[in-house]
């Protein structure tokens, strides 16, 4: 009797974060293969002011609903049969998230899920490891550096330790980096905040076990594009890029100390990221330095960092197979 293979499923995944909302339409096979059909990003800054007010701002909600309506059109045109909408840090923290849910439901026709920090981290790990496991050994420390939070996941084939930290590019900008470019005092305060968070994280996540450090999301990919000297953003060059630790730290330092105008002059820089990238790369540089130090304390050396364009969005898509 001939063996028939199960067909692929066309799925649509939406990741609604603190700074951006992204869509991935893909064909997912029963073996976990993923073939991209359409991928989009819009900067909506949903988390605008949430760290201070505890609420999603009306103008931020409207930007997000408008993007959701556009994504609903793409989903219908591409014929996706399964849709999952996952919201993360900003929505978790907001007192008016029911208003957000009502607007998304009206715009896109599905119930938005507000992921816990642990679930967000697990989805990020699944997407990231699928993109790098063939070329790099575990254990992997996957770092998903978002606008409102940073997810840390340590594991090999599945997450062993998961932790979500309330440090991200938008949150740290609003808390500390008010000048353009940041003043030394603002930078020192931000670094102290991030280091305190990493000290707490180190009590839960054994950073020293890391064999491959994998960075995800816009702050990391922008720093990688800068380190590679790209004049325009090239996803195929950024995904899977392996950089020396010192290259990463130098690129982060340069981006942090540039003015917004000088960041915008970089051909790869998304206009909606230029004002928060300084805080994002500050967080990333502190994570890289901390992991390198803890690996060294275990008698090993961390010399390289991997960047993945496969992240929570891919993890959401894979969960729909």
Where are these regions (language model features)?
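A generic, well-ordered mixed alpha/beta core segment in the N-terminal half of proteins
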Residues: 141-149, 153
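Helical "lid/coupling" subdomains associated with nucleotide-phosphate turnover
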Residues: 6-11, 30, 44, 49-77, ...
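A structural signal for short, well-ordered beta-strand segments
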Residues: 16, 40-42
């Amino acid at each position: 009797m001939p063996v028939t293979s199960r067909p692929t499923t066309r799925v649509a995944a939406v990741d609604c974060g603190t700074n951006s909302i992204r869509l991935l339409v893909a064909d997912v096979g029963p073996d976990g293969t993923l073939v991209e059909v359409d991928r989009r990003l819009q900067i909506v800054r949903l988390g605008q002011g949430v760290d201070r007010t505890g609420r999603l701002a009306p103008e931020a909600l409207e930007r997000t609903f408008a993007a959701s309506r556009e994504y609903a059109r793409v989903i219908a045109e591409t014929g996706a049969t399964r849709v999952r909408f996952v919201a993360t840090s900003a929505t978790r923290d907001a007192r008016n998230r029911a208003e957000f849910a009502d607007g998304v439901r009206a715009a896109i026709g599905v119930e938005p899920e507000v992921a816990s920090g642990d679930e967000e981290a697990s989805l990020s790990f699944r997407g990231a490891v699928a993109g790098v496991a063939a070329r790099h050994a575990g254990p992997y420390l996957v770092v998903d550096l978002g606008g409102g939070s940073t997810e840390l996941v340590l594991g090999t084939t599945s997450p062993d330790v998961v932790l979500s930290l309330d440090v991200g590019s938008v949150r740290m900008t609003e808390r500390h980096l008010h000048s353009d470019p940041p003043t030394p005092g603002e930078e020192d305060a931000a670094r102290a905040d991030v280091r305190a968070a990493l000290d707490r994280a180190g009590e839960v996540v054994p950073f020293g076990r890391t064999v491959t450090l994998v960075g995800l999301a816009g702050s990391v990919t922008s720093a990688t594009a800068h380190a590679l000297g790209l004049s325009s953003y090239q996803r195929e060059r950024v995904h899977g890029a392996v950089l020396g630790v010192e290259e990463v730290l130098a690129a982060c330092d340069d981006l942090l100390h540039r003015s917004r105008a000088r960041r915008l002059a970089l051909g790869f820089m998304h206009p909606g990221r230029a004002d928060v990238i300084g805080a994002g790369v500050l967080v990333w540089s502190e994570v890289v330095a901390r992991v390198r130090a803890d690996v060294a304390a275990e008698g090993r050396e961390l010399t390289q960092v991997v960047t993945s364009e496969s992240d929570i969005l891919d993890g959401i898509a894979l969960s729909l197979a």
